[in-house]
């Protein structure tokens, strides 16, 4: 047995310190543009989780509606993550020919196509 098999208080303290350090570094080292995008991603993720929870709890009676909403949430999340990767200054070397404005225009175009497909699927 290792020496770490003691009480869980030390582990909880270290998890708390990791969370505090993450929040401090995220607050100081992340641009406001990325923070807004992260808030959007959190909203879309929670929307998809809520829809999935509703599906498990209540049912999927209008199945096309459930699938459309869930596909919209998942697709929007994926497109948002792609946008975040492209506009992150740390990834500038990988996306040299793409400006943040171009990445946002691509995001809007892909989101429009996604939602046209979703609306078509609803019927």
UniProtKB/Swiss-Prot annotation:
It is found in: Endoplasmic reticulum membrane. Residues 62 are lumenal. The keyword Transmembrane applies. One of its GO terms (biological process) is apoptotic process. Pfam families: DAD. The keyword RNA-binding does not apply. Pathway: Protein modification; protein glycosylation. Component of the oligosaccharyltransferase (OST) complex. PANTHER family: DOLICHYL-DIPHOSPHOOLIGOSACCHARIDE--PROTEIN GLYCOSYLTRANSFERASE SUBUNIT DAD1 (PTHR10705:SF0). Subunit of the oligosaccharyl transferase (OST) complex that catalyzes the initial transfer of a defined glycan (Glc(3)Man(9)GlcNAc(2) in eukaryotes) from the lipid carrier dolichol-pyrophosphate to an asparagine residue within an Asn-X-Ser/Thr consensus motif in nascent polypeptide chains, the first step in protein N-glycosylation. N-glycosylation occurs cotranslationally and the complex associates with the Sec61 complex at the channel-forming translocon complex that mediates protein translocation across the endoplasmic reticulum (ER). All subunits are required for a maximal enzyme activity. This is Dolichyl-diphosphooligosaccharide--protein glycosyltransferase subunit DAD1. It comes from Gallus gallus. The gene is DAD1.
